Amino acid sequence: MENFPTEYFLNTTVRLLEYIRYRDSNYTREERIENLHYAYNKAAHHFAQPRQQQLLKVDPKRLQASLQTIVGMVVYSWAKVSKECMADLSIHYTYTLVLDDSKDDPYPTMVNYFDDLQAGREQAHPWWALVNEHFPNVLRHFGPFCSLNLIRSTLDFFEGCWIEQYNFGGFPGSHDYPQFLRRMNGLGHCVGASLWPKEQFNERSLFLEITSAIAQMENWMVWVNDLMSFYKEFDDERDQISLVKNYVVSDEISLHEALEKLTQDTLHSSKQMVAVFSDKDPQVMDTIECFMHGYVTWHLCDRRYRLSEIYEKVKEEKTEDAQKFCKFYEQAANVGAVSPSEWAYPPVAQLANVRSKDVKEVQKPFLSSIELVE
């Protein structure tokens, strides 16, 4: 395995943050913790229900980690929506992360998918059964156009996860394959459409702006995620089917060339995002900018992405990119580095245990280094 290209990664990340004029001021610390706990608490109670526990069959520690990661993503990025919308989106996107980590073969339970859908029968695939049950709670926040995007993008995501189970990076020469798979499993349209709740945005009068935002967000959010995930995925055997690695196989290019391709696409998309909406409806631009800044903060602060390791490695270096990266990282940490012990309680496993014993909800938080993922 070749060495991680630290200098290149620093330069790319710094340019990205400069292009989007990164300055996350979405919340005060108190507001951030309040929203995190509200969304987490509702989502944790949802996943602690016996039906969810029985059908998902997810390791409690992994479910806890997935929930904490997703609540952070939603609260940090969807800064302009209501707390109730944050909570419902947190549940939906936690389901997607659970599916993304699943290794179960979907084929047997998808044979009659459309027949069951048309007849109004419960889906045989347990994930779809649970997601469909929760979907009305999500869609109630949005108009019909945005709702259709959420439904369609979620269906695409399921199919993308199905494809990923084959660990197939594409045939050499199949240049369309990497972006085909990334668009399918990236949830870009779901994310782009879920920024516009109907209580805040009239999707009929802002139809062109919302449509354009969904189109731009599809690539921007997945490319930024791919770029900022590159470090954690670089030498992880479980993360070898990524956009960059698929470019290497399908385009028959080097890893450096593949990373450069992703870099240029991400930077161009960032320029577009700012340029296209800077003179449009101010509320639309504000929502997009808050999302971009919060999304970056989440990546820099969430332990899943391990970017603190890059910071520790380069914080004593005197190069311009190293110093700029560290400044951005510290800026993000000042607003976004919040310990889960301050908001992610009680653990899902404890709530599930309480429910199974038919005991009333525990009032005092119980924090365990085993059950709560720091």
Curated annotation (Swiss-Prot):
Benzyl triethylammonium cation (BTAC) acts as a competitive inhibitor of trichodiene synthase reaction in the presence of pyrophosphate (PPi). Mg(2+) 1 binds at D100, E164. InterPro entries: Isoprenoid_synthase_dom_sf, TRI5_ascomyc, Trichodiene_synth. Some of the cofactor binding sites show unusual localization within the protein. GO terms for biological process: sesquiterpenoid biosynthetic process. Disulfide bonds: none annotated. Keywords: Lyase, Magnesium, Metal-binding. Mg(2+) 2 binds at N225, S229, E233. It is an enzyme of class 4 (lyase). Gene3D superfamilies: Farnesyl Diphosphate Synthase. Induction: Expression is positively regulated by the trichothecene cluster-specific transcription activator TRI10. Expression is induced between 18h and 21h growth on GYEP medium. The initial detection of trichothecenes occurs several hours after the initial detection of TRI5. The initiation of trichothecene biosynthesis occurs with a high concentration of glucose remaining in the culture medium. Pathway: Sesquiterpene biosynthesis; trichothecene biosynthesis. Belongs to the trichodiene synthase family. Trichodiene synthase; part of the core gene cluster that mediates the biosynthesis of trichothecenes, a very large family of chemically related bicyclic sesquiterpene compounds acting as mycotoxins, including T2-toxin. The biosynthesis of trichothecenes begins with the cyclization of farnesyl diphosphate to trichodiene and is catalyzed by the trichodiene synthase TRI5. Trichodiene undergoes a series of oxygenations catalyzed by the cytochrome P450 monooxygenase TRI4. This is Trichodiene synthase. It comes from Fusarium sporotrichioides. The lineage of its organism: Eukaryota, Fungi, Dikarya, Ascomycota, Pezizomycotina.
